[in-house]
Amino acid sequence: MKKAVLAVLIAAFVTAVIYAVPINGETEIYNKVVRLHVIANSDSEEDQALKLAVRDAILEKVSSATENCSSREEAEDVISSMLPEIVKQAEKTLRDNGSEYHVSALIGKENYPTREYGDIRLPAGNYSSLRVMIGKAEGKNWWCVLFPPLCTGTAKPDDTLVAAGFTPGEVRILTDSESPEYTLKFRILEIFGSLFS
C-alpha cells in the first residue's frame, strides 16, 4: 500500500513538473505583457469602491502614456518613469473620495493565475506587473492587462495584440476558446498548486 501511494505521489510530482514548463509559445506571451494588480486596503464595501476608483484613474493615466508603445519593454520603461505620478494620481483619487490611505506602487515580476478578459485567456505565469497597494493592501485584488491595453476597450483584442507584437500563433493561444488542451493543463497546475499553498 505504501509503495502504491509513493508511486502516485511521484507520478503526480513528475506530471506537475512537466506541466509547469511553459509550452507552445506561452513564454513569449509572458514576455509581451504588462499586467495591472490593484490591491484594496480591505474587503469593506467602501475600500472596494476606492480600489475601483483608483483602478480607473490609473488605467486612464497609464493607457494614454503607453498608447504608442510597441513592446513590453518600452511600456515598462514608460510606466517605471511614471511611478511617482501614478502614486500621486492614486492618492489624489483617494482624497477626492474622502480617504487618507497611503498608496505604494512598483513594477516587477509577479505570479498571476489564469485569467479571462472577454475573449482573451491569459495563462497562469510570471508576468511583468504594475502593482498598486492601497493602505494596508489586505483587501481583494483587481487584475487586468495594462499593456497591450486590454482593459480599456479601446480596440478589438486581436488588433491590439497584433499591434503589441504578438504573432498569429500567440493570438490564437490567447483567443482560442476551443482549446481545452490549454485549459486542462492550466487547471491541473492550479489544482496541484492549491494542494501545497
What is each PLM-predicted segment?
Residues 31, 35-68:
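Short extracytoplasmic
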Residues 18-31:
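Aromatic-capped interface at the extracytoplasmic side
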Residues 173-197:
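Bioactive mature segments of secreted peptide hormones/signaling peptides processed from precursors
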Residues 72-113:
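Amphipathic, coiled-coil-like alpha-helical scaffolding segments used for oligomerization/assembly
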Residues 4-20:
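Hydrophobic membrane-insertion alpha-helices, especially the h-region
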Residues 57-69, 85-97, 153, 191:
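Structured segments of extracytoplasmic/periplasmic soluble domains
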Residues 119-182:
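Soluble extracytoplasmic domains of inner/organellar membrane proteins
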Residues 33-39, 102-106, 129-133, 143-145:
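Soluble periplasmic/extracytoplasmic beta-strand elements of cell-envelope proteins
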